[in-house]
Amino acid sequence: TKGDKGISAAPFLNSYHRLDMYPQSMTWKLGDPIVDFQPLKGTTNEVGALFASLNFFDEMLYQKFTRESGNPLIKLKKFSESFGELVFPVVDFANYLGISLTDIQFLLYELTEFGFIDYDNDRMIITCYPKMFDYIDAQSGLKDFDKIIIQSKASVNAQLSLSSLDLKINGIERVLLSQAKKVWIMPTNNQLIVKKNRDMNFDGLITAGKTQYYGDGFSFLYEDFKLNLSKCDSMFIWADYKESKKAGQLVRSPSVIESLNGYIQIDDMDNKSGRDTSMHAFPKLYSNVETYVYYDDPSIQNGIYSRDNFMFIINPFVLDSLDKFTNQALSLNGTFMSGGIFPDFIDSLSLQEDYSLGFIRNTPSDGFNIYSQLASYDNEIRLSNEGLKGSGTIEFHTTTALSEDVTFYPDSLSAIAHTFTNIKQEDDPEIPLVKGQNCQVKYVPKENQLYANSIEDKFIFFDDEEADLTGGIVLGYDGLKGDGIMRFGKGEVQSLLYTYETDAILSDTAEFRLVSSDKDLDALSFKTQNLNARVDFGTRIGEFKSNSGESFVTFPENEYICYMDQFNWFMDNDDLEMKNSKQAAADINIDTDLDLAVSNFYSINPDQDSINFGSSKARFDVRRKKITCTKIEFIKIADSRIVP
């Protein structure tokens, strides 16, 4: 057991592991293969114990003993050298100093407590330990030293295996290996194994300057002064804050470098103290194998980039000055695999605006084919924890889109295109000229289709730019399709599915409307539904046929309704021709004695007492808002019939 002060507090000297050990007690049961170092029996709380390297040096401790007459360590050294022995009588040393035994004893107790000497009070003998000479040489700059102290706070501070001679130390928060280079370790389960001459095995965390490493099977080699990273699961980098108000502070990069195998050279093996500050390259990381950065974290585009095929493979590398490299200096060469979005290409990782590891690069002059398809992309590619993004030109079939905001997903491309152009194709299938601005674009390679949707600006169609679309279009090798509202002059068509020719709009099921004027597009003068539509800008005629026999037609401004099955709109004249080749609709229950063979017209003005009449043909003048009906047999008003 040990005491708290003086000779009783002197450390256990461990020459195999080369440690001064400061536990309260050492316990060994006869025949037991384990020696325990622990607090004294009866101690209820966990008690701290120190395990210090025999080459540990603390200048404050050295100066603690310095007096006006000098430092007693130097006097002990000089006397030992003059005496020619490391062991000598206390009386002789007291006479050498010219002081009494009583005056010197307290100093000798204190020097013994810190492991510089051994003072045998019974035999009145002083034994000088190597630590004393090392401290003097370290203070003088003649000898290197270290700063390694292991602090333990546990119910059992350490255990020595008599079979392997491994010293397992428990209750460790962290161990500083180099103060100058900012290297320390934090072992898993707060324990590590000390091997011969201060070598250590441990799992857990290593911090080396602005880098951190998590893993198992780590080892510290004292003589070489390096850390072996045999199984490093993950490496993190701490970057300098870019904001001026946070200058000098660090932020951890969200990117993880995985599967690292290599070692960290903490400092030159003869500069464990870090006193020689000219060695700027240390600490230095040597990565001996390919390492990987993945982008499958849920915070990155909801984790859509699978680590199975989307990664940056870093070549073996050397990274020096781990404690002071700049954001701009970090560059890790390797190969980017995008899961088939782009061809694999060589590049280098660096710190991005969000502090993640990524890159900004341009495509080759002729662009990249994307998704192994006929589509291509040209200009800037950006990789960060925002995902795989870019700003450039997207080309597919007859479409070219320019965007400053492109996001590449494994199964698709999404962009806000500030310019969208689909050139006209007169060969089969016919495709019209389409232009757009500030639209949403999505390319789906498995479907071989490009989708575009208007946001605020409409798509402009055809050579003369006579039609526009509020909605979406789909381009494939089978042609162009669309949905939404198409407007042309005073007419508009609404459909869930359009097909197109170079100068025509087609739809199997559509709603057709005419507006009162170009300025007021919400003031309807004509409306009908469920039509097969063809609007031809070559002939300047819109042809509409009812899909249900007759279509219900509304004239809001005229306050009339009718049923017709064919409509021809002559867009240059703003003139609509309506025909009915079938029986009048019979599902409107209006009291009338007419037995018409053509569709009925009905007034919906409550003051006109449900005026109705039959007409198989009519015209509607959009400009004048005038309905002209022909082949009317009579109009019944009250008890009278009017024959026009």
Annotate the PLM regions.
Residues T1-P644:
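Structural signature for solvent-exposed beta-strand/loop edge elements and short helix-capping sites
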